From Swiss-Prot:
Subunit comment: Interacts with FMNL2; this interaction promotes muscle-derived satellite cell (MDSC) migration and differentiation.
Keyword Cytoplasm recorded: yes
Family statement: Belongs to the TCP11 family.
InterPro entries: Tcp11
Subcellular location(s) of the protein: Cytoplasm, Cytoskeleton
Source organism phylogeny: Eukaryota, Metazoa, Chordata, Craniata, Vertebrata
Natural source organism: Bos taurus
Annotated protein name in UniProt: T-complex protein 11-like protein 2
S-S pairs: none
Modified residues (Phosphoserine): S16
Residue ranges of the region described as Disordered: 1-57
Length: 519
């Protein structure tokens, strides 16, 4: 309808294919206007595939860049639909206080005011109303399945705009009757969640307000239809996701050779760390060791995945192969950091007052709840962690003393309380031993999950000191393992090529050079 083309957004803030296409078309037009052809030279494309290569740099054209963007948009959308059970489309509601929101409200109101004045005129002017019914007819027809011929014919017959115009010319048109038919038809086609909206439409007497609300409910029904289609597609996408994503990424790689640069650096960093660790472990003082340490590709890749649990998602760019799961990994990491902090607080509390509170599981639950509530949002930049840890320490002391008093036991003295609060506050300090210990144990637990078959038959045992967060840790661990296992299935061949070059490339090159010198 006029003035009703609100932009729709994808929940989870994912880009839509249509937005990408419109952007591509507008940019292509601009490119044609400014120059006959615009091209971009990728940094990685200028690098030779081997040290001896003298091939000229590959030029990536503008069209190839935009084609890669469309492929990435399609792949991201398909991935989100398949792995996110809560994914749905929803309308983008502009804040009423914003300039855009106020402008839209004014323009909409002006349109409906004009329509009302036309219908109240003597004689009434029906042309705008007829155009609205024409648009309503097309929307209703779009909801029908191919087999709905009977209802299709009925809609076309009742909302025949040529006939309505003839009736209007003779002042015989029944606008209210047409609106009632539309509402009745909407009631047959809508999802049960819209039944209340249909009842409100039937109870509205002002014809202009009825038409206005009809379009509002039709917009909701369109979203319902799209989300129903998404739910129907999800099982099919889940079955085809691995092949689809791998094919799309291969197309992106062909159009943009630099599409694996960040991924290569991500894996290379793990290779260097593992080589350093292995060298330090195997090097004997005073002995000469000329052999190159051998690394397991699986070990290197798993350690690369573990690095994502300590990633700075605000400042550090993700590997290209993990872009589709970036938001999930960031959320998982933030929740994991909160669990680490809760486990640290519980361990300190248990070490200091565990003997006094032994056999009081309800107290442990209360202390955990206090920590979890106060640590909510701890990953935000504005969060004052030291102050919150101090507050948690004070609250813990209050709860422990309250429990001890209820059982007629002596409360914690001031020295113990100060010591407890002080240890809590020191957790945020760099290289804190308690934090390092808990972090290492959680890393070991997550690493053990990556070695299990998918799906795992049973969960591995939780390391000591983590029992207080066992349930939450197992849940996050399963989410993490599912993300990693799906990512391995999709991008395994690309990782294999990168690992082959990083782990065996120099050796292969050396053999080739030795062979050529012998000949």
């Amino acid at each position: 309808m006029p003035f009703n083309g609100e932009k729709q957004c994808v929940s989870e803030d994912q880009p839509s294919d249509s937005d990408s296409s419109r952007f591509s078309e507008s940019m292509a037009s601009l490119s044609d206007y400014e120059c006959s052809r615009q091209s971009f030279t990728s940094d990685s494309s200028s690098k030779s595939s081997s040290p001896a290569s003298t091939s000229p740099p590959r030029v990536v054209t503008f069209d190839e860049v935009m084609a890669a963007a469309r492929n990435l948009s399609n792949m991201t959308l398909a991935h989100e639909i398949a792995v996110n059970e809560n994914f749905q489309l929803k309308q983008d509601a502009l804040p009423e206080s914003s300039l855009a929101g106020r402008v839209r409200h004014i323009v909409h109101q002006a349109f409906w005011d004009v329509l009302e004045s036309e219908l109240n005129a003597e004689p009434p002017e029906y042309e705008h109303a007829i155009k609205l019914f024409e648009e309503i007819r097309e929307i209703l027809l779009s909801f029908l399945t191919p087999g709905g011929n009977r209802l299709r014919n009925q809609i076309c017959e009742v909302l025949d705009t040529d006939l309505i115009r003839q009736q209007a010319e003779h002042s015989a048109v029944d606008i209210q009757g047409l609106a009632n038919y539309v509402i009745s038809t909407m009631g047959k086609l809508c999802a049960p969640v819209r039944d209340d909206d249909i009842r409100e439409l039937k109870a509205t007497s002002n014809i202009v307000e009825v038409l206005r609300q009809i379009f509002h409910v039709l917009d909701l029904m369109k979203m319902d239809m799209v989300n129903f289609t998404i739910r129907s597609l999800r099982p099919h996408l889940q079955r085809q996701l691995v092949d689809y994503e791998r094919t799309k990424f291969q197309e992106i790689l062909e159009e943009t050779p630099s599409a694996l640069n960040q991924t290569t650096e991500w894996i290379k960093e793990s290779v260097h760390e593992e080589l350093l660790s292995l060298s330090e472990a195997t090097l004997t003082p005073g002995a000469e060791n000329n052999s190159k340490p051998s690394l397991s590709p699986t070990l290197v890749l798993n350690n690369s995945y573990l690095k994502l649990l300590q990633w700075d998602y605000q400042k550090k760019e993700l590997p290209e192969t993990l872009m589709t799961d970036g938001a999930r990994l960031q959320e998982l990491t933030e929740k994991l950091n909160q669990l680490k902090m809760i486990a640290c607080l519980a361990l300190i509390t248990n070490n200091m007052v565990g003997a006094l509170t032994e056999g009081l599981p309800e107290l442990a639950v209360r202390l955990k709840r206090i920590s979890a509530v106060l640590l909510e949002g701890m990953n935000k930049e504005t969060f004052n962690l030291k102050e919150v840890l101090n507050s948690i320490g004070i609250q813990i002391c209050v709860e422990v003393n309250k429990t001890l008093m209820e059982r007629g036991l002596p409360t914690l003295n001031a020295e113990v309380q100060d010591n407890l609060v002080g240890q809590f506050s020191s957790i945020e300090e760099e290289d804190n031993p308690i934090w390092s210990l808990i972090d290492k144990r959680i890393q070991l637990y997550m690493k053990s999950l990556l070695c299990l078959p998918s799906p795992p038959r049973c969960m591995p045992p939780v390391p000591g000191g983590l029992a207080v967060v066992q349930q939450e840790l197992e849940s996050l661990g399963l989410q993490y393992a599912n993300i990693v296992n799906l990512n391995k299935q999709v991008y395994g061949p690309f990782y294999a090529n990168i690992l082959r070059k990083l782990l065996f490339g120099e050796e292969a090159t050396g053999k080739a050079e030795a062979s050529s010198s012998t000949n």
